Swiss-Prot record:
EC code(s) of this entry: 3.4.11.9
PROSITE patterns from the UniProt entry: PROLINE_PEPTIDASE (PS00491)
Similarity comment: family membership: Belongs to the peptidase M24B family.
Segments for region (Disordered): 641-660
Entry cofactors: Mn(2+)
GO molecular function: manganese ion binding; metalloaminopeptidase activity
Catalyzed reactions: Release of any N-terminal amino acid, including proline, that is linked to proline, even from a dipeptide or tripeptide
Cofactor binding, note field: Binds 2 manganese ions per subunit.
Protein name (database record): Probable Xaa-Pro aminopeptidase PTRG_10574
GO terms of biological process kind: proteolysis
Function: Catalyzes the removal of a penultimate prolyl residue from the N-termini of peptides.
Keyword Cell inner membrane: no
Keyword Manganese: yes
């Protein structure tokens, strides 16, 4: 296609008196996936000026012991640098020459008859953002020829187990450790093309959630909910789900990744629907929890929903570049503890005491969220969340909380990225989920938390039993971090808007998708809303919505509402001794003490706890039962053993244990 000299054309037409109609026809798409741009970003992260990157695509294969083809799912690292969603392909990038080469299989007649043909070299060159196309059978020859001409340069592959077909002699020159971290750093920051696809996936999934809300009163089984959601997505050309849908009703919602989706809805209070589609390989991840009728079935269900919604809104409000995500995870636990204390589920302690014991994990056991992109749990683990080059401004912003303050509520096995102790700060272009939840897992409560003296003293059994039928509540949105704050890409309704849709039975316009709302902190800065200057948080951070209990001394001074006593007394123990208390005066201390004494916090005290059979089944009086999982449990156990006259005994749980 010839290049149009627009400048020269405009100069010539300037002297003409007639009007001209210019018709342009493009032979290729203007909206190609930016594979070449991604390749250059990876090279910049590798920090090398010469070398070769090799990535294999996913081969076509059959199901095990079957002649039926397995569902094809392209390898995400390969796709990130190629934009090619065809099987049996390979990719090579010559770093010094800046040449991106795609290798595709030859077209075979039997493949065309049964499965249709793939792209020809000319079609692939027009379709993908690449420089050259060759057939796969030429891969070994081309790489060997390149290696012969570049004797002292490295070849980069993704994994130590990866190999280049026909190039085993090149193994001493292969670097299998540098490429994946470099690609992960690139994949965490989404470009405009990627954001467009994630937004589209969110729009389709949000419409599917609306359809479910509008029809939920008609349905009798979880399978119908799953079926409708997938039907809406497929009809909008989003044929792949980012993960297996979770349509959990009643107690099933207490299982985080429940996927049976086959139980009747009769007698259940709530449905937790966690489902999101893929659009052109990019994922969405949305959760809505809603009643199965036109109103809240119980006050307990409404209370838990409102608490989870408050947890989510409090955390989303603070998302912007420079914020440490783990701080928001901690904050979500503190909001949860406040709410559970008010409801009487937690008791006999302050927020600080309950937090330090880790008891809130009985009800909020997972991380606040994760990256989302080509994978629903996208790249961004601990070693990849370090402060990036070129972002020195964040290096001077420490965590909002003291070192290791996350220990009681963080578990590396269950809290996925970016909720990680080594996480640094959110950056513009990241897309993360915010998905707090409150769950009532009967198994976890009976087998760990209630038998443990560390946790059981804070749990009111009588009140807890009233909340067990709720099952669980989770609310999840996908959030884009922008230069000025954040944008919520998820448009599925929540709260009153959600209830109205259930009552009306109308999902809204199905052909025109509702645009995503945009939130900008710079726009909000024009009003007189007071702002914070807490360590680790930008000066543009808005004042939170928290209203902590009067006696709780768990949040920094800056996180108290202004119409409350905006200070923390200097007397007594505090986890925040490093924080300044500029507003603390003797007069305010006296006011705080008077208010504390005149309006004491009413905490529900449990009646005599029901006797529980220990997990091991041993009820002998001289056997001391202690249940441990964290470092704090072990420390408490050591103190308990040292101060008691009895000797802790381990008892086998079954005959097999006795043999061992």
């Amino acid at each position: 296609m010839e290049v149009l000299d627009a400048t020269g054309l405009a100069e010539r037409l300037r002297w003409e008196d007639n009007d001209y109609l210019l018709h342009l026809k493009a032979e290729t798409s203007f909206d190609k996936y930016p594979a070449k741009q991604h390749a250059r970003r990876v090279q910049a992260e590798l920090g090398v000026e010469d070398g070769l990157i090799y990535l294999p695509g996913q081969p076509a294969r059959n199901n095990e012991d079957s002649d039926m083809p397995a569902p094809f799912r392209q390898r995400r690292y390969f796709y990130y640098m190629s934009g090619c969603d065809e099987p049996d392909c390979h990719l090579m990038y010559d770093i010094r020459r800046d040449v991106l080469t795609l290798f595709i299989p030859r077209i075979k007649p039997e493949r065309v008859i049964w499965n249709g043909r793939g792209s020809t070299p000319a079609e692939a060159l027009a379709k993908y953002d690449i420089d050259q196309v060759h057939h796969s059978q030429d891969l070994a020859y081309i790489i060997q020829n390149w290696a012969f001409k570049h004797q002292n340069t490295g070849i980069y592959i993704l994994h130590p187990s990866s190999r280049i077909p026909g190039c085993d002699n090149l193994m001493p020159r292969i670097d299998s450790h540098s490429l994946q971290p470099a690609m992960n750093l690139c994949r965490m920051i989404k470009d405009d093309h990627e954001i467009k696809r994630i937004r589209k996936a969110n729009d389709i999934s949000s419409q599917a959630h609306r359809e479910v809300l509008a029809n939920i009163q008609k349905y009798k089984n979880e399978a119908q909910v799953e079926g409708l959601f997938m039907d809406v997505c497929i009809s909008r050309q989003a044929k792949q789900q980012a993960y297996d849908p979770i349509a959990a009703s009643g107690p099933n919602a207490g299982t985080l990744h429940y996927d049976a989706n086959n139980e009747d809805l009769a007698g259940r209070q709530l449905m937790c629907l966690d489902a999101g589609c893929e659009f052109e390989l990019y994922a969405s991840d949305i959760t809505r929890t809603f009643p199965l009728s036109a109103s809240w079935p119980s006050k307990e269900a409404e209370n838990i929903y409102n608490l989870v919604q408050r947890m989510q809104e409090t955390c989303i409000e603070r998302l912007e570049p420079g914020v440490r995500y783990l701080d928001l995870h901690i904050m979500a636990h503190q909001v949860a503890i406040d709410g559970l204390l008010r409801l009487g589920i937690l008791c006999n302690g302050t927020r600080e005491e309950i937090y330090k014991a880790g008891t809130s994990r009985a009800f909020f056991p997972h991380g606040l969220g994760h990256h989302i992109g080509l994978e629903v749990h996208d790249v961004g683990q601990a070693e990849l969340m370090s402060v990036r080059r070129g972002k020195p401004v964040y290096q001077q912003a420490p965590s909002l909380y003291p070192e290791n303050f996350h220990d009681p509520v963080y578990d590396s096995e269950t809290c996925h990225a970016p909720t990680d102790p080594q996480s640094s700060h959110l950056e513009e272009g990241m897309v993360v989920t915010v998905e707090p939840g409150i769950y009532f897992s009967v198994y976890a409560l009976q087998h760990f938390y209630l038998p443990s003296p560390i946790h059981s003293k804070f749990i009111n059994l009588e009140v807890l039993e009233r909340y067990l039928p709720v099952g669980g509540v989770r609310i999840e949105d996908d959030i884009l971090i922008t230069a000025n704050g954040h944008e919520n890409l998820t448009t599925a309704p929540k709260g009153e808007a959600m209830l109205d849709m259930i009552r009306q039975g109308k999902p809204g316009t199905t052909d025109v998708l509702i645009p995503s709302p945009t939130y900008s902190r710079r726009m909000r800065s024009e009003n007189n809303t007071p702002r914070l200057c807490a360590p680790g948080i930008s000066k543009n951070t808005l004042r939170p919505l928290l209203t902590p209990l009067a006696r709780a001394a768990t949040l920094p001074t800056e996180f108290r509402q202004q119409d409350d006593f905006d200070f923390e007394p200097t007397v007594g123990p505090s986890l925040f001794s490093g924080f300044s208390r500029a507003m603390t005066t003797e007069e305010k201390i006296q006011q705080w003490k008077q208010k504390r004494d005149s309006v004491p916090v009413a905490l529900n005290r449990p009646t005599k706890a029901k006797s529980l059979s220990p997990v091991c089944g041993e009820n002998t009086p001289n056997v001391q039962h202690v249940y441990m999982s964290t470092a704090s449990d072990l420390a408490s156990f050591s103190q308990l053993s040292a101060g008691s006259g009895s000797t802790p005994l381990w008892k086998p749980h079954n005959k097999q244990d006795k043999k061992n």
